[in-house]
Each structure stands twice: as C-alpha cells, then as structure tokens.
Swiss-Prot record:
Its main location: cytoplasm. Coiled coil: none annotated. Keywords: Cytoplasm, DNA replication, DNA-directed DNA polymerase, Nucleotidyltransferase, Transferase. One of its GO terms (molecular function) is nucleic acid binding. This is DNA polymerase III subunit alpha. Pfam families: DNA_pol3_alpha, DNA_pol3_finger, DNA_pol_IIIA_C, HHH_6, PHP, tRNA_anti-codon. InterPro entries: DNA_pol3_alpha_NTPase_dom, DNA_pol3_alpha_thumb_dom, DNA_pol3_finger, DNA_pol_IIIA_C, DnaE2/DnaE/PolC, DNAPol_HHH, NA-bd_OB-fold, NA-bd_OB_tRNA. GO terms for biological process: DNA replication. DNA polymerase III is a complex, multichain enzyme responsible for most of the replicative synthesis in bacteria. This DNA polymerase also exhibits 3' to 5' exonuclease activity. The alpha chain is the DNA polymerase. The gene is dnaE. It comes from Pseudomonas fluorescens. Belongs to the DNA polymerase type-C family. DnaE subfamily. One of its GO terms (cellular component) is cytoplasm. It catalyses: DNA(n) + a 2'-deoxyribonucleoside 5'-triphosphate = DNA(n+1) + diphosphate.
Length: 1173
C-alpha cells in the first residue's frame, strides 16, 4: 500500500520574503506524486488563496488554507516565534483573515507583522495550530534547555486549541532539528499531544535551492557571499514525495499519519463567482427596483429639458418616446440581471463628487453606451445622439458584472474614496493589491547583485534585453544575437542569465491598484484579509483584482485622469476672472460642440497640450483629416492606432471624407444601402465595434446581444467558430432576402475590420474631453496653458515643449519671482503666465509655503530682507542658491530693471551679486533670529543701518556671470533655459549653414542640416559588436533623436558629449515608435569644424587705439595659440583712413569658441564676427 502524507507547511512565491513555489507547477507536481491534498501557509498572508483554491480543485487536489504567523513573546524583549494555523471551516477562515488583517493594521513593528497571543486566543475557533517546530516558542524553549517552559507553553496552547493543537517536527538537515524533535516526542508522550511531521517546503525540486537562496538574498539586499546574510534554509526543503517523508520519519509513523488526519479535518468551501453588493439605502415603502426606475425617469426628464426643450422641439412627443423606449429597455435588462444596486452605488458617489467640487469625466469605456448611466449622471454623453450601444456594455445574452471605469480629477479622487468608506463603513471599503514581479531587465540586475557580480557587467547584460512591453528573457535570447554571443563567451554573464531565467516572473513586491476599490456588504475580512503599510495607511485587499472579484466582491474603478485636473485648474482661474467682471461661471459641460475657433485650432494641428492629440503623428493625421465636427474627432481617436494606420483604413477614411474616393457602404464592389445609416458617420468605413454589431443586426437579424457575441468571436479568430458564425450570418441575411455572395463578402470584410474596431463609447467620451481641452486652448489660452504647465511641472521634457508652445502662442510668460509666484503656474491680472516656484528643482511645497507666508507682510525688498523674513528652517542654503540661479530672486538684486531690455542687459551682473551676497544674507538673518529669540536688543547689528543703505555695496564687484554660467544655472534649476539658450550665442552664424530649426524638419530623403545642443547620449553595440549611438538634439525650437550607426559614430565619437553644440547632417524620417521624427546621421561637426569648413573668414573691426604696444603683442600671441585654416580679415580704422586688410596664410586660425570669446572680451562683441560664404 502506497504511503499517505500531506504537506502542511509550504510557502509559495507570495510569501515575498522567501518561497519559490509557484501555484501551477505545485499542482502539477502534486498530481504527478498522487498526493490527495496540500496546505499553503504563506508568511503573514493569504494572497495566493484564490489561485491556489481554483487550481487545486481543478486538479482534484484538496486545498487546505492556512498561514505562518509571527507570534509576540510574553517578554517584550524576548525573541519572536512562529505558529502555523490551518483552516478547518468557514468560521476558521473568518478568524484567520481577522488575525492576519489585525496583524497588518495593529501589529506592525520594525517591518514585521506580529500577532499578539491574546488575539489568537480570542479567534481560535475553526483553526488547527501547528507549533512551528524549532521556530515556535515551544521548540525554542526546548533548544534553549528549558523543558519546563516548553511544557507550560504546550499546556497553554492545548487549552486554547483543545484537540486542535499539534507538536510539529521536522528533519530538514538544519541545525537543532533533531534536538527539537526529541524534545517534542518526549513532551507528546507526557501530555498526550499528537505529533505532526512537516517539511517546511520552500521550493518544488531539490535543485531549486540555489535559486531560492538567491531570491532570499535579493529580498534582503545582500550578496550570497555576504557573511551577514541569513542562512535559514537547506536543500532538503523541497516538495518531497509521500514515500520520502514516510522513510524520513519511519521511526515516528504517527507523525506522518496525522498529516492525513489533519487534511481530513480541514474542509473549507470557498464560494467563487457569486457577487455580493452592499445594500443601497432606499426610501421606505419602495423596492430597490421601483426606486431605480424612479430615479432613472426623474433623471431623464432633467436631461430632456436641455436636450429637447418642449417649447422649441418639433415632434417633441415622438422624439421623447425614443428615449423612453430605450430607457425602459435598459431598465428591464438591468433589473432582470440584478444590477440596480450597482448602478445606484456608482450614481451616488459620482453625484457626491460633482456636488463637492471633484470633477468627473464624461465617461470611459463601454459604460458611455448606457442611457441609464446618462440619465443618472454617471456619464455625460447622450448615447442616442452618437449611436452608442447598451449591449456593448451589458449583454443580456452573456451575463457578467457591469464595470464602470470612472475618471476623477487627480486632486479629488481620494476624497471620493474617503466618502465611500465613510458611507459604507471603513471596515467594508478597501483598495486592491497588485503584485510586482521580477521582470526581464530587472531580474538580471537583481541576480547579478545577489551573486556579487560587478555593476558594469549587470548593466551591460541588462541593457542587451530590449525595453519592450511583454519582453521575456527567452524572447530576448531568441531575437538578440549580440546577447546570445555575449552569454556564450562570458562565463559570469552565463551564470547570471541561468539564474535569472529561474527567477523571472517570481512575485517580488506588492503595490496598490491604480483605481480599483471594493465595497463589501459586511466587513471586508469576511471575504479577504487586509494588507497595509506599517503606519496602518493604504489598506488593500490581499487578493488581486481578479481574485477579489472571484471571491465575491465587486470592483469599482476610481481612476485619476490628469486632464480633468487641468480642466479644473483652468476653470478656477477663468471663473475667478469672470467673477471680477460679473460674468456667470463657465461650466465646461455646456460649451458649444460646434465652435468654429476650436475646429480652426484643430485643423491647424495646434494641439500641443490638447488631450490625446499631442504627438507629432497625431498632428500629421489631424492636418490630413481637417476635422470639422465632433464625430470626426471621435473617429480620429479610434483611427490613430497601429491597426488602422497600417491597414490603409486611415487613408481610405480621409479620401472618402474629402471626396477623393467613392462613398460606399461598406465597399464599392459589394454595397448594401441598408448600412448607410450605420456607416455614414465614418464615410462607409467599419471603424467601431458598435458598427460590427449593427451590421449583424441590420443585415442578418441578430439581436444586439447576439451581435456582441459575434463581435467577440471575431476578435478571437478561431477558424471553427468563425465558419459557424459565417454560416449563421449568411442564413440570417437570406431571411432578409440578401444575396449569399453579398452576405459572404460583407461578412469577410466585417471580420477583417473587427480586429481593428474600437469601442465607440470610449472614443466618444474621450473625444469629448479632447474637444473640451481644445476649446479651452482656443478661448482661454493663458489659464489653460498655466494649468497644463502646473500638471507637468516635474516633467522637464514636457515643460520645455510647453514653454516653447507658450512662446509660439505669443502668450506672455513671467520668470519665477518670489514676490509674485505661487507654487503652481498662475495667470496674473494682466493675463501673463507667472512661472510656478514649485517647478524649480529642490523647491518643494514647504519652502514655497515659507515664502508665501512671509510675503503676506509685503513684498520682499532685497535678499537680506528675504532671508530675515522667511523661515530658514524650511529654506536652506541649497534652496536659496536654486532660487537665485533660476531667476526667482532677480527682482531683489541691485541691478534689476522693470524695462525688459535694461533687465536683460544687467541680468548677469545682478545674479552674480546675489550669489556673492548669499552667505552674508543668511548669516545676518540667523544672527537677527538668535538675538530676537534671546530677547536682547542687538545694539550693533542693524541699529544704525540707514533705510536706503546699499546692502550690496561690498558685493557689487563680483565677477559677472557669463551667458553659459547663467544658462547652466537655469538648466540646473528649471530643467530648461528661460532667459536664453546656448544656441543664442551662435544663432546668427548657424543660420548661415543650418537654415532649418528642429521644429521645421520634415521627412525627406535629401540630406538636411540642423544645429543644436546634445542633451542626451546613449551608446550601445550592434549585432557585430560595433558601437553605435543615439543623441537627442535641442535647438530651443524642439528636440529630435538622432541615430549614428557604426561608421558615423566612429567618425564623430570624440564630438559626442552632453551639452556640446554640434552641426549634424543626415536624413529625416518618421519614427513610428515615438510618433515623432528621427534623424539618421551621416556627419557630425563641432561648431569649430563647421566654421572652418563653411566660414569665409574671421572679421575684426579695429581702430588705432586697439593695436598699441601690449595689445598688439597680446593679439599676436593669442592668434599663434589658435593656428588653423580659417583666414582673418581686419577692417582697420585710423584717424586718417579706413582700410580692409587680409592677414597672410601664416596667420590662419582655428575659429574656436575660446578664441572668439577672448577677442570679443578685448575688442567688443560687435567688432568680432565670422563671415560666411
């Protein structure tokens, strides 16, 4: 008879700190071994429960759920110990989830989740306790030579768990196993307590031990050869067979048999697939269905009062009846499916958000197709006007939970979640956990670090793995020849790779789902344990989004959409200004959708900062499409995707719109005029999933529910299923007297485009948001751009683009200023955008609060006044330096001038003095503060300072900043150049040989020349091992990525430095990946090279006094130090004559920046310049 044994202690990958067991391989291994049951006891969690339960039940293996827990010590200073709890029944499940949740909420200390002994005693019903062998407090007492203490503890736990307590023993070849085992056997005999054998499993196969050790080291942040790392595991902790365990404990057969007895006692029935909603409060005397109908019809009347004003609408009753019929149809289905409660809950929290100043999106996903959602103000787009289908959202022929994804303003989303928690009970509302895994690139670095390999090797190997969504190590190995070759020749790289493959995809950490929130009908722990951080914040379910829904909880998506925040910020500024002139506040929901200036802006593709329409590729499509109505904008969102772009659908759509191609419904060769109403909005093109459904309805008599099933089948592309569906479609068409050939051809066309079809409901809702942002940009450009800049102010690349757009729009922009700026970008009374202080690096909300609080007493007069008045505990020297170099303190300097030209002329002197005075200003302020705090008058520290004294007197001789120094200061603090650009120094001359700016480049096969500064550089090797490079060029007008393949890179390598000014020649093409342009470089020149190659001569304009004695010698020495190939001509003026002199060939020079700057410093900027051919 084969041995019987059940593993009762096992950690999966979800233990996070250790454990390498993955659920599916575990179930497969158990099936192969013929084991009837298994327990999963992850450390402090039940995150894997649903996956484990489903997979085990599916394979005919009995799942036992449990957990290993850290137990507090009676002595607060004593060591922690473990216990293992197994669930016997539903009450045990609830108790274990309560214990684990309580541990996270109330028991976290120093990164450990600790369960108090009293909690276990209070919640022991329905649970079996294993003593955790040598890691339990009884085992620790035995090993510590305290048998009396061990006995007392065992008696205590036997009383708490009568007939449900087991002394656990192990033989895993770890220190103290046998000592604890012998003590447990003796104690069992004395007390009559049963023994149970476990193997404390951490991995499936014995050879996985090394991988497990590596995983543990990655979690600890230590290397395998680090003597400080924990060594708590052995290679015996694998999933041993029943025979191996029986042999291991052949002297203690009862300990093996008890594993089976425990398995028999554990009978948990996890109900999966049934959904539970909280009760929505309804008025007395009404059922939920009656109330649901009432609020829906009340909402319809409110909507129709705007959509169909009774006094001005022709055929009012007939038009109203269309809405009533659709509403009744939807209500019947929703009630029949049992979902009124879901709609009412969503309606309630959206209405609360709108009533409490939290902007809500007009809709998202297929939910925008529901009229019930529209009349309940869950969505804000009329589904009838845009042919949006309810069945795309809720299909009565395929019952599944409705799923509204709701967009909220980022600033207010958490307030809405807090409202829901308050309404339904904080113990019933939670967000949802996510699990981060060891992904392809990251696992290579993690393994290399754990193995003690060099950073350089880890970096090199990781960079060979392509940065693509869904990339795996196996895929990377197959497609990257350079990677395969490297692994073959480098032994250390091969070691990393082999281990990384074993650990790839293993769960590494936890996070919070972007928007998922669950609302339980009772307390959450009846369904799922809770996880949270040490502060008790950020409560999340321990089941992920799929598992939590399987467990019966309904997920609501509270998503944060940055664009809604932008619209909200813009409206606050707009309505502030409207209030000043007694105009009513603007409501974005009621702007006209046929606004001419908005469509003019869109047709010109001036869509930087417009939601969804910002990329270069999108702008090109907009220019071709020339959209002139909201239907076109909705279509645009659906068209700009890889499928339509690559299929020719986009060109066909554009040509049909502009009359360059025949309108056909759907194809010139096989038309069915009955499809015209369905396809007219898209000029006969099958663009939307809803159109696929409507074609099946119109031609073949499908219900829209059945048509949705057809659409789904087409998306799966299973040949047998498609053949069946094709037959049904043709048969349905025959019933409508439609020719079989025509039906077959149209079916084939629909099938082809079904794969490209987009959800029109989503496209329409997001198209409306795009229109709203375009409308704001067209009518209120400054408030809109200030809001966009505020939303993106920590994304330097975006700010650069947006500031350039502000300049293109000819909006006025004020530099940051401590006297007028707020944290965010704002608009002042003159309509100028004021730079936000929060956009300065190192200046967070704390320093800005200190500044705005201090200036309530009046504007700052100078740097000393500023330092004396602000709280220097919140503004340190580094912050002050950043404020000066960004220009935020320019107005406090001695050379500031309100007139722009005068300000620009003195800006470098001004900032130099401020920087020089900074230390003294800080010391003076600190001294004043100390004196004030001590309560003594400072007799000498300011008593005799005159009101108009020059506080900068001793600093005025500070060396003036150079243009480069000033601009570097701005780049370091703002991430961009505000008062100029390094290219300004060269602007006049580079336009002689690089006539195009980056923003003006267009794809062409001809070689184009552009000049700019290298702001990013990336070097890698091609498949042959040759170096190639990628640089990002910036010329203030824009940025472009340029690629240098091996030959070009080799020639230009010495010139490729960050912040270097270069002139580049190459071919410009579209970059499908970024949606922008890419430059393939043929040649790179430094500015000196470009001058040498393209300049005719260096021209000097000098007078007699410039060439006397020392000056002439100085000039000769300087020119000798810069010999080269560029000729010099001199325009010489004496009191008697003016002549043009050509220097001889021996005086030819290299026109380097250093030479030109030295000459300009000596003779003046206007007297030294390069002449070009």
């Amino acid at each position: 008879m084969p041995a019987s044994f059940v593993h009762l202690r096992l950690h999966t990958e979800y233990s996070l700190v250790d454990g390498l067991v993955r659920i599916k391989p575990l179930v497969k291994a158990l099936t192969g071994m013929g084991m009837p049951a298994v327990a999963v006891t992850d450390q402090n969690n039940m995150c894997s429960l649903v996956k484990f339960y489903k997979n085990a039940m599916g394979a005919g293996i009995k799942p036992i759920c449990g957990a290993d827990l850290w137990l507090s010590n009676k002595d607060p200073d004593g060591p922690l110990s473990r216990i293992s709890l197994l669930v016997m029944n539903a009450q045990g499940y609830r108790n274990l989830t309560e214990l684990i949740s309580r541990g996270f909420i109330d028991g976290q200390r120093n990164g450990m989740v600790i369960i108090e002994r009293e909690w276990v005693a209070e919640a022991n019903e329905g649970l079996i306790m294993l003593s955790a062998a040598k890691e339990g407090e009884i085992g620790m007492a035995m090993i510590g030579g305290n048998p009396a203490e061990a006995e007392a503890l065992a008696r205590e736990w036997m009383a708490v768990f009568p007939d449900r307590f087991y002394l656990e023993i192990q033989r895993t070849n770890r220190p103290n196993d046998e000592e604890q085992l012998h003590g447990a056997v003796a104690l069992a005999d004395k007390l009559g307590a049963p023994l149970v054998a476990t193997n404390d499993v951490r991995f499936i196969k014995q050879e996985d031990f090394a991988a497990h050790e590596t995983r543990v080291c990655i979690g600890e942040g230590r290397a395998l050869d680090d003597p400080r790392r924990s060594k708590n595991y052995s290679d015996q902790q694998y999933l041993k067979s029943a025979e191996e365990m029986a042999e291991l404990f052949s002297d203690l057969p009862d300990a093996i048999e008890n594993t089976v007895e425990i398995a028999k006692r554990c009978n948990i029935d996890v109900k999966l697939g049934k959904h539970f909603l909280p009760d929505y409060p309804i008025p007395d005397g009404m059922t939920i269905d009656e109330y649901f109908r009432k609020v829906s019809f009340d909402g319809l009347e409110e909507r129709l009062s705007v959509l169909l004003p009774k006094d001005t609408t022709e055929d009012y009753e007939a038009k109203r009846q269309v809405y009533v019929d659709r509403l009744n149809f939807e209500l019947d289905i929703i009630i029949q499916m049992g979902f009124p409660g879901y709609f009412l809950i969503v309606m309630d929290f959206i209405q609360w958000a709108k009533n409490n100043g939290v902007p809500v999106g007009p809709g998202r996903g297929s939910g925008a197709g529901s009229l019930v959602a529209y009349v309940q103000k869950i969505t804000d787009l009329d589904p009838l006007e845009y042919d949006l289908l309810f069945e795309r959202f809720l299909n009565p022929e395929r019952v599944s939970m409705p799923d509204f994804d709701v967009d909220f303003c980022m600033d207010g989303r958490d307030r809405v979640i807090d409202y829901v928690a308050e309404k339904y009970g904080r113990n019933a509302v939670s967000q949802i956990i996510t699990f981060g895994s060891m992904a392809a690139k990251a696992v290579v670095r993690d393994v290399a670090r754990a193995q003690g390999k060099s950073f350089g090797l880890a970096d090199r190997l990781s960079k060979m793995v392509p940065f693509e969504v869904g990339m795996t190590l196996e895929k990377a190995y197959e497609q990257e020849e350079i990677l395969r070759d490297f692994i073959k020749v480098d032994e250390e790289a091969a070691e990393i790779w082999e281990m990384a493959r074993k650990l790839e995809g293993v769960v590494r950490n936890v996070g919070k789902h972007a928007g998922g929130v669950v609302i339980a009908p009772t307390k959450l722990t009846d369904f799922s344990p809770i996880y949270c951080d040490e502060a008790g914040d950020g409560l999340v379910t321990q089941f992920d989004k799929d598992d939590v829904e399987a467990a019966g909880l309904v997920k609501f998506d509270f998503l944060g959409l940055r664009t809604l925040t932008i619209i909200d910020w813009a409206l606050k500024t707009i309505n502030r200004d409207r209030a000043k002139v007694n105009e009513p506040p603007l409501d974005i929901a009621f702007i006209p959708l046929d606004d001419k200036p908005t469509y003019q802006l869109l047709q010109k593709a001036e869509t930087t900062a417009v939601f969804q329409l910002e990329s270069r590729g999108m702008k090109e499509l907009i220019k071709k499409l020339k959209l002139d109505c909201l239907e076109d904008l909705i279509a645009l969102v659906a068209l700009f995707r890889p499928g339509p772009l690559q299929s020719g659908m986009v060109d066909d759509f554009i040509n049909r719109k502009h009359g360059r191609a025949e309108l056909a419904y759907p194809h010139p060769d096989y038309q069915y005029e009955g499809l015209q109403p369905v396809l007219a909005p898209t000029y006969g093109i099958i663009l939307y999933q809803e159109q696929v459904m409507q074609i099946a309805q119109v031609m073949a008599g499908y219900t829209l529910g059945g048509a949705d099933m057809l659409r789904r089948a087409m998306g799966k592309k299973k040949p047998e299923e498609m053949a069946k569906q094709r037959g049904g479609f043709i048969e349905g068409c025959a019933s409508n007297n439609i020719d079989a050939d025509l039906a077959g051809n149209i079916f084939d066309l629909v099938e082809k485009f079904a794969g490209y079809g987009f959800n029109k409901s989503h496209s329409a809702a997001y198209g409306l948001v795009s229109y709203q942002t375009a409308w704001l940009k067209a009518h209120y450009p400054a408030p809109f751009m200030a809001a966009v800049l505020s939303a993106d102010m920590h994304n330097t690349d975006k700010v650069v683009t947006l500031i350039e757009e502000v300049r293109t729009m000819k909006l006025r922009l004020d530099a940051p200023d401590v006297n007028t700026s707020e944290f965010k970008f704002t608009v002042n009374d003159e309509g100028r955008i004021v730079y936000g202080l929060g956009a300065i690096k190192g200046v967070g909300e704390g320093p800005v609060e200190a500044i705005t609080e201090a200036r309530q007493a009046g504007p700052f007069k100078d740097l000393f006044d500023f330092c004396a008045r602000v709280d220097l505990k919140r503004i340190n020297k580094r912050t002050l330096d950043g404020l000066i170099r960004s220009g935020a303190l320019d107005r406090l300097g001695p050379y500031f001038h309100d007139e722009q030209k005068a300000y620009q002329a003195n800006i470098d002197r001004n900032r130099a003095v401020l920087l020089a005075a900074m230390e003294e200003a800080i010391k003076s302020a600190e001294q004043t503060a100390r004196t004030r705090d001590s309560g003594h008058a400072d007799l000498f520290g300011g008593l005799f300072v005159e009101e108009d004294a020059d506080v900068y007197a001793i600093h005025r001789k500070a060396k003036e900043l150079t243009l480069k120094e000033r601009l570097k200061g701005e780049k370091d603090t703002l991430g961009l150049y505000l008062t100029g650009h390094p290219i300004d120094e060269y602007e006049g001359e580079i336009r002689r040989f690089a006539r195009q700016r980056i923003i003006d480049l267009k794809p062409a096969r001809d070689t184009q020349t552009v000049a700019g500064m290298i702001i990013a550089l990336r070097v890698m090797k091609n498949k042959k091992g040759d170096k190639m490079g990628f640089i990002t060029l910036d010329d203030r007008s824009g940025r472009i990525e340029a690629s240098l393949f091996a030959d070009a890179f080799h020639s230009a390598q010495s010139l490729l430095q960050t912040d270097a000014m270069v002139v580049v020649e190459g071919e410009v093409s579209n970059d499908d990946f970024s949606g922008g342009l890419r430059l393939r470089v043929k040649r790179v020149m430094s500015m000196e090279d470009a001058r040498t190659n393209l300049a005719e001569s260096l021209r000097l304009k000098l007078q007699t006094q410039d060439l006397k004695g020392d000056q002439l010698r100085w000039l000769g020495d300087l020119l000798k130090r810069h010999r080269g190939a560029c000729p010099i001509t001199m325009e010489y003026t004496s009191p008697d004559a003016k002549t043009l002199l050509q220097f001889g060939e021996t005086w030819r020079i290299d026109p380097a920046d250093a030479l030109i700057q030295a000459l300009r410093d000596q003779f003046g900027r206007d007297n030294v310049f390069l002449q070009y051919r």
